Amino acid sequence: MKLLLTSSMILCFSVFANAQNIKKQEAEKIIKTYFSGYLQKDWNMTASQLADGFTFSSPAGDDHIPIAVYKERCFPNSKFFGTIDFPEIMVDGNKALVIYEITTTNSKVIRNVEYWTFSDGKVKSIECFFGGTGVGYPANAQNK
């Protein structure tokens, strides 16, 4: 009986632990679909990747803002997105570190790093990091 109970507990814990992890291919697909919404100026495509309770943070005063505020503050920048490249996407467990380069519609380059967390196949949070001069914003991007 003890063996059965112990085995059941181990199985439950391992299933729960594995449910928290995301495969690299799945994370990359979510990330690229999220950014495709920006490239296509399609909020619904981007929003479809976000979990309930999603938050966004950045050095621009965005401290764990909710989806509605994120849409209002950040998504309008999609009008500046020309192309995007991903030099690196690193996934570990339910987290990813994403390095990306956006070339704006006026040929300026933005390079950001973001720390993503996932929950049930959706993006739970994004923490964006860029230089203190606000280079992460398209209006402040540097010439190519």
Residue ranges and their predicted role:
Residues L4-T6, S14-N44, S48, A139-K144:
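Short, low-complexity N-terminal intrinsically disordered segments enriched in polar/charged residues
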Residues L50, Y100-T104, F130:
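Short beta-strand segments enriched in hydrophobic/aromatic residues
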Residues G53-I65, N77-F80:
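A short gly/proline-enriched turn/hairpin at secondary-structure junctions
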Residues K71-K108, V113:
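Surface-exposed, charged secondary-structure patches
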